[in-house]
C-alpha cells in the first residue's frame, strides 16, 4: 500500500527529479494528466431518463408485438456471423462488397425458408439500414418482382413463378425488376422496348430498337439475375397498346447469357457498390405468349387484345418500394441522430476559462438547433411510416379479397383507397427521403472531423442513401404527381363533392378553410395547440391549392414547384395527425413519457413545418405576423432547452444496438476515444508503416539533385570549358 500511496502522492504533487539518478517516478517519464471520461458524461445523462424505455419503444413501433419482434430480430442479426456488422466492412473494395452481399443473400434465403414471411420482411428491412446493397437486391427479387407478378399476373402465373419456380424462396432463379431505360427513367409510359406478338409462333419478340431504349440501372443484371420483369410496349397487329409487363429469361441453367441478350456492368456508382447494376439490350428475343403477365391486359392465341377498365391497378406493385423507403427514412434517422447526439454529449470543445472544463457540444445553442429538430422529425416519422405500412398491407388484402370474391363495392372502395395511397406514399417517400439525406449530412458535420471517418458510418451511408431520392419515383416527379392530385381534390370539394373512405377527408373542410379571413394562429398560445396547428396546415393546403386552380387550366408544368410544396404539406399533415392521435390514444396524461413527447411534437411542427414555410403561412394569412418571430426564433430554442437534458434517453428509446448502429463514436457506452483508437488499430495494423507505394515516395524523397540528373551539363565548369 505504501508504494501505491507514494505513486499517488507523486501523481498529485509531482516533483522535479534527476531521471539519470532516480528514474523510478512515473510522473517524470509519461504524462500524468487525467484522460477525458466521455463515458461518464453519457452515463450521467442516461440516468436522467425518467420514463419506461419499453413503453416508449412500443409507442414508436406501433404495438407491443412489433416492438418485441424488432428487438428479437436485432439480437438474431447481431448473433449471426454472416449478417452482423464489423468495422472492417468499411474498407471493402467493390468486389469484396459484392462477395459479402452474395454471402448475406445466401444466409438470408435460409431465414426466408424457415420463418413467416412477415417476420422475414421485417428482418430484411432492418438489414437494409446497414446493408442497402443486400436490401435492394433481395427486395427486387422477392418484393418488386413477385409483387409485379402478383399484381399483373394471373393466379396460375403467380403460382408458377413464385411457387413452382421457387422465386418466393430465392431458389432456382434470381430475378430482377426494372423499367428504367437509358433514355427514360420514371416515365414508365415512355418506355420504348417493343414486345411484338407473332401470331404464327404464338410468341412475343422482345427487341431494343435503339440505344435510348437500353435497359439501364438494372440491379443484378451484370452478373446475377436469371430472369427479369421487363416493361415493354405491347404491339399486336401493328397497334401499340402501351406498356405492359413480360417475364424475360436472361441466362440459361449454366448461367450463360441466352441468345439475343446483351448485358454489361454500368461501373462504379456513388454508393451501393454491392449491387451489380447493369445494362440490357434485347435483339429479337422470343418468349412464349404466356410469359406476358395477363391479369389485366390479355392477348389470346389469335391476337385479340382485351383491356379491362381496372388496368390502372397494375401499377400498385410500385407502392411497396415507396412505402419501404419511407420506413427506411425513420430507421436511418434513428441511427444517425443516436450517433450524433451521443457524440455531442461525449465530446467537449472549448472552455469558458478560469480552469473550467470544456463545454459539451450539446450545450451549445447552435448544436441543439442543428440536431434536435431532426430528432423530433425521426419520432414523427416512426409513427407515420408505421401507419403507412399498415395502410398499404390492408390495401393489398382488400384488393385480393375484392377480386377473389368479385365484391364490386369493396373493389370500388379499394380503388378509392389506392388513389389516396399513391398520394400518401408519394408524399412521404419524397419528403422523408429528402429530409433523411439532410439529416445524415447535418449529423456528420455536427461530429466535426470524426464524422468524416468511414468507421463512423456517415460517408458510406450518405452515398448509399442518395439514390433513395431519385429511384422508385424521382422525388420531384412524385411530389408533382401528389400535388396535382391534391389540387384536383380541393377543386372537386369546392365544387360540392364530399370525400369518403379517403385519407384526404380532412380536405372536406376546404370551402370554409380556403375562404377564412381570420388567421388560424394569432397568438403565442395557439402555437401550443396541436389541433390548431393541424387546422393551420389544412387551411394552408386549401388556400394554396385553390390559388393554383386557375393556373392549372393553362399549364400544370408552370406550377411544378408549388405542386411539390403541396406534397410536403401533405406529408407533414399526415405525420402530425398520426402522432397526435397515437399520443392521445396510447400515452396516459400522467405517464412520465408524455411531457417529453409533447415537447417532441411541438419542436417537430415548429422547426419542420411552421418555421420553414413561414412565408407561405403569412402570405395566405394562416399565421399572424405578430407571432412569426416567436415561431422562428424564440419558441424553438425554448423547446430545445426542455428536450436537451434527455437526449440520451430519447435516442436510447429507439433501442438500436451497437452492432446495428455500427459507428465507433456512437456506441452505447460513450467511450468514444478508446473505442475509436482500439478499433482503428485493430483494422489497420500499425506495424504496416510502409505503404505498398512506398517505392514511389522514396524515389521522390531521395531523388538526385537537378544538376546531377542533368549530368552536370549546365554547370559552371562545363560553361567555362564550352565558352572558351
Curated annotation (Swiss-Prot):
This is Acyl-coenzyme A oxidase 2. GO terms for biological process: fatty acid beta-oxidation using acyl-CoA oxidase; lipid homeostasis. Residues 7-21 have a biased composition (Basic and acidic residues). Disulfide bonds: none annotated. It comes from Candida maltosa (Yeast). GO terms for cellular component: peroxisome. Belongs to the acyl-CoA oxidase family. The keyword Cytoplasm does not apply. Its cofactor is FAD.
Amino acid at each position: 500500500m505504501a508504494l501505491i500511496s507514494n505513486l499517488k502522492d507523486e501523481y498529485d504533487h509531482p516533483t522535479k527529479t534527476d531521471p539519470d539518478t532516480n528514474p523510478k517516478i512515473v510522473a517524470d517519464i509519461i504524462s500524468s494528466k487525467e484522460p477525458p471520461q466521455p463515458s461518464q458524461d453519457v452515463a450521467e445523462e442516461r440516468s436522467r431518463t425518467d420514463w419506461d424505455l419499453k413503453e416508449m419503444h412500443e409507442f414508436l413501433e406501433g404495438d407491443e408485438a412489433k416492438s418485441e419482434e424488432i428487438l428479437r430480430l436485432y439480437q438474431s442479426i447481431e448473433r449471426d456471423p454472416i449478417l452482423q456488422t464489423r468495422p472492417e466492412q468499411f474498407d471493402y473494395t467493390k468486389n469484396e462488397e459484392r462477395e459479402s452481399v452474395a454471402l448475406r443473400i445466401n444466409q438470408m434465403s435460409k431465414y426466408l425458408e424457415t420463418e413467416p414471411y412477415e417476420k422475414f420482411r421485417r428482418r430484411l428491412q432492418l438489414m437494409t439500414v446497414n446493408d442497402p446493397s443486400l436490401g435492394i437486391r433481395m427486395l427486387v427479387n422477392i418484393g418488386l418482382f413477385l409483387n409485379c407478378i402478383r399484381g399483373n399476373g394471373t393466379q396460375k402465373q403467380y403460382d408458377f413463378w413464385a411457387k413452382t419456380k421457387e422465386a418466393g424462396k430465392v431458389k432456382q432463379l434470381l430475378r430482377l425488376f426494372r423499367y428504367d431505360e437509358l433514355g427514360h427513367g420514371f416515365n414508365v409510359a415512355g418506355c420504348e422496348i417493343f414486345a411484338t406478338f407473332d401470331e404464327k409462333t404464338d410468341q412475343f419478340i422482345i427487341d431494343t430498337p435503339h440505344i435510348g431504349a437500353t435497359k439501364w440501372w438494372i440491379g443484378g443484371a451484370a452478373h446475377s439475375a436469371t430472369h427479369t420483369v421487363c416493361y415493354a410496349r405491347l404491339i399486336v397487329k401493328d397497334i401499340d397498346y402501351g406498356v405492359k409487363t413480360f417475364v424475360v429469361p436472361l441466362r440459361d441453367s449454366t448461367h450463360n447469357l441466352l441468345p439475343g441478350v446483351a448485358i454489361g456492368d454500368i461501373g462504379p456508382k456513388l454508393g451501393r457498390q454491392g449491387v451489380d447494376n447493369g445494362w440490357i439490350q434485347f435483339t429479337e428475343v422470343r418468349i412464349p405468349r404466356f410469359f406476358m403477365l395477363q391479369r389485366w391486359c390479355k392477348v389470346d392465341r389469335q391476337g385479340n387484345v382485351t383491356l379491362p377498365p381496372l388496368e390502372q391497378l397494375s401499377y400498385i406493385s410500385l407502392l411497396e418500394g415507396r412505402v419501404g423507403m419511407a420506413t427506411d427514412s425513420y430507421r436511418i434517422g434513428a441511427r444517425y441522430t443516436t450517433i450524433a447526439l451521443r457524440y455531442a454529449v461525449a465530446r467537449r470543445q472549448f472552455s469558458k476559462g478560469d480552469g473550467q472544463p470544456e463545454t459539451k457540444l450539446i450545450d451549445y445553442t447552435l448544436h441543439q438547433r442543428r440536431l434536435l429538430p431532426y430528432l423530433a422529425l425521426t419520432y414523427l416519422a416512426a409513427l407515420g411510416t408505421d401507419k403507412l405500412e399498415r395502410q398499404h398491407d390492408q390495401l393489398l388484402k382488400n384488393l385480393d379479397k375484392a377480386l377473389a370474391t368479385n365484391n364490386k363495392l369493396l373493389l370500388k372502395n379499394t380503388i378509392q383507397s389506392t388513389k389516396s395511397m399513391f398520394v400518401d406514399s408519394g408524399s412521404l417517400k419524397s419528403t422523408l427521403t429528402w429530409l433523411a439525406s439532410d439529416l445524415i449530412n447535418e449529423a456528420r458535420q455536427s461530429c466535426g472531423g470524426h464524422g468524416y471517418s468511414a468507421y463512423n458510418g456517415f460517408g458510406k451511408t450518405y452515398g448509399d442513401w442518395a439514390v433513395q431520392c431519385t429511384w422508385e419515383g424521382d422525388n420531384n416527379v412524385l411530389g408533382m404527381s401528389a400535388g396535382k392530385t391534391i389540387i384536383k381534390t380541393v377543386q372537386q370539394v369546392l365544387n360540392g363533392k364530399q370525400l369518403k373512405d379517403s385519407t384526404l377527408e380532412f380536405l372536406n373542410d376546404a370551402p370554409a378553410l380556403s375562404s377564412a379571413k381570420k388567421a388560424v394562429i394569432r397568438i403565442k398560445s395557439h402555437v401550443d395547440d396541436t389541433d390548431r396547428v393541424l387546422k393551420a396546415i389544412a387551411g394552408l393546403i386549401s388556400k394554396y391549392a385553390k390559388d393554383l386552380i386557375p393556373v392549372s387550366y393553362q399549364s400544370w408544368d408552370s406550377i411544378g414547384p408549388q405542386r411539390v410544396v403541396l406534397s410536403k404539406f401533405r406529408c407533414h399533415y399526415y405525420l402530425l395527425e398520426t402522432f397526435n392521435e397515437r399520443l392521445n390514444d396510447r400515452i396516459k396524461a400522467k405517464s412520465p413519457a408524455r411531457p417529453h413527447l409533447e415537447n417532441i411534437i411541438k419542436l417537430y411542427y415548429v422547426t419542420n413545418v411552421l418555421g420553414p414555410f413561414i412565408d407561405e403561412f403569412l402570405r395566405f394569412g394562416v399565421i399572424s405576423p405578430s407571432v412569426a418571430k416567436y415561431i422562428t426564433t424564440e419558441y424553438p430554442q425554448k423547446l430545445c432547452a426542455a428536450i436537451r437534458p434527455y437526449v440520451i434517453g430519447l435516442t436510447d428509446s429507439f433501442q438500436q444496438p451497437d452492432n446495428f448502429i455500427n459507428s465507433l463514436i456512437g456506441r452505447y457506452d460513450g467511450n468514444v476515444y478508446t473505442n475509436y483508437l482500439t478499433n482503428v488499430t485493430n483494422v489497420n495494423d500499425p506495424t504496416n508503416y510502409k505503404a505498398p507505394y512506398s517505392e514511389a515516395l522514396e524515389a521522390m524523397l531521395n531523388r538526385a539533385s537537378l544538376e546531377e540528373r542533368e549530368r552536370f551539363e549546365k554547370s559552371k565548369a562545363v560553361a567555362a570549358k564550352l565558352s572558351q
